[in-house]
């Protein structure tokens, strides 16, 4: 459930309250959901899935009060992938601003201002863990992954400055990808149509042809 569900039924509380905050990578409605895995691993705790598809850091800021109303013991924050994609080029930025109804295009400079502010607002939780964001495609030298790397370097620095735990999602995924026994054939295309084709193509292979997400 989400914070809004918990606040409507506080009697559902069990164990620690763990709030997992982020975007579609946390929501997990397409692909494997790491929040569901946490629920399986820690059944005695209340785990809130506060991932919303497409969210940038500013949007998380706007909804953080309802999450804090649940008095979470632990917060896991992974936010920045959409900020990185929106700031990758002008067309992506305009698309995010239009689709998310934002007052301005997300930029790296704005992210550097808003992420520390968001972490300050979460400081009431007993434990806060900040995640780096995953790669886009499998080519570490691609322009988009160099752009993502810039965000991750700032995330790592922020975790040090705020003295909070860092979960190195990016490094762990790159380590895993380095073990692959197949060559990558495609890489990220910032245009909307190729992205949609790849997303829905992956969904078809998984849900219709029953391939595992790893095989997809």
Q: In which residue ranges do the predicted regions lie?
A:
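Short intrinsically disordered, low-complexity coil segments enriched in acidic
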Residues: 1-4, 19, 127-128, 215
């Amino acid at each position: 459930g989400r914070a809004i569900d918990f606040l409507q039924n506080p009697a559902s509380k069990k164990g620690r309250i763990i709030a997992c905050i982020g975007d579609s990578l946390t929501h997990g409605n397409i692909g494997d959901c790491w929040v569901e895995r946490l629920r399986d691993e820690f059944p005695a705790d209340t785990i809130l899935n506060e991932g919303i598809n497409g969210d940038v850091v500013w949007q998380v800021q706007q909804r953080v009060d309802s999450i804090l109303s649940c008095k979470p013991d632990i917060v896991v924050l992974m936010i920045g992938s959409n900020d990185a994609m929106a700031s990758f080029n002008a067309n992506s930025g305009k698309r995010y601003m239009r689709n998310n109804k934002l007052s301005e295009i997300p930029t790296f400079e704005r992210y550097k201002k808003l992420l520390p502010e968001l972490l300050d607002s979460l400081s009431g939780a007993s434990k806060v863990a900040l995640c780096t964001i995953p790669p886009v495609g499998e080519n570490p030298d691609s322009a988009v992954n160099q752009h993502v790397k810039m965000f991750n370097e700032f995330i790592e620095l922020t975790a040090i400055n705020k003295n909070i735990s860092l979960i190195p999602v990016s490094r762990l995924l790159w380590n895993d990808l380095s073990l692959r026994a197949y060559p990558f054939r495609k890489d990220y295309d910032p245009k909307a149509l190729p992205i949609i084709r790849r997303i829905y193509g992956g969904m078809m292979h998984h849900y219709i042809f029953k391939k595992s997400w790893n095989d997809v």
